[in-house]
Amino acid sequence: MKTQLFVAMAALSISCSSFAENIPNQTIADSKVLQPITGVRVSMQRMVKSNEGRYFMSLYAGINNPHAELYDLVENKTIKFKGTQKGDQLNLKSVSSEESTDTYQLSGVLNANTGLFKALLSDQKNTFGTSIQFEPAFKVANKPVFVFKFYGQNDATNPYGKTLQRIDVINKNNNTVAQTLTAFTGYPNSIGYMDINFDGYYDVLVSDVSNGRQVEDKRYIYWMYNPKTQQFQRSPQLEKIVGLPNLHGEKRQIDFGNGQIYQVENGLLNKISNE
């Protein structure tokens, strides 16, 4: 039987608040004129849990094809959903899997600012449904609400035709620029927005396409939100890891693929190996 061995990585076993460090931003004067980029998808992963503690869910909403993974911590099973969204209303249906062929429906109203999701879960045995109140899994007070504006350049030598080179972080409450992220060359079609270190604050993830890299290389640029400075800061430690971070908030684990699984525990990032 496999046992899990927690191996503290010298370069990575640091406080979660120290994942990031300040890296000077590139001044606009040092770069070419950048043009606004529209249609950039913000892939936001919301991690929510039910009030009674039975369910944990990773929810991707506000995109063309909203989807979710619902973990039933009592019955120890996972249900994947896909569906539609109109305004704040989500209507999701389960996707068949090897684990289960049962059909489930999950519908409800999502508050995009607070992360509260009032939902109704139904199946063949319970067509009336069970009311579930979801809330952020990692709650913090005064969490900022941001939106983004994107800028870049056309690049005929790049396989994507252009590159993302600047992100303006806009405070949604007063429509002011809270921060400008620069000094990078990124994939121009989408960014990730997720709580990578499970501290309750969302972080920014961009696919690095500098120096001939492509999306398939799975190299990423990380900006971790620091609530003390109220700024996003680059994380060279995370940027050394190859692989797309797959977050398992119910276990506080990050899976980068190829056996690279890290546990966030007591403010430390530890690598898990199986033997």
Where are these regions (language model features)?
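Cleavable N-terminal signal peptides
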Residues: 7-8, 18
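Positively charged n-region of N-terminal signal peptides that target proteins for export
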Residues: 1-5
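N-terminal signal peptide c-region/cleavage motif recognized by signal peptidases
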Residues: 13-17
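Beta-propeller-forming repeat regions
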Residues: 21-196, 201-275
